[in-house]
Amino acid sequence: MTRGNELHEAVKRSLERYFKDMDGEQPTAIYDMVLKNIEKPMIETVLGHAEGNQSRAAEMLGINRNTLRKKMQQLRIKG
């Protein structure tokens, strides 16, 4: 299994658990919930691997450095 597939399966398992925990209730705003729960740890982890270098982290993420800085501010990630 490739790393992308592992991540895919982890997200899928988490969502299946989430639906099970909802016990038949209709969830809303799942897309935003997933992004909010994935985006911050993803950026923090990539920044760690980039040794705090925001330009390198942005390149690793495939986003513009200014976009990274904006997301860091929004998510209250210190840099």
Question: Which sequence ranges carry the predicted segments?
Answer:
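Bacterial C-terminal helix-turn-helix
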Residues: 2-6, 13-79
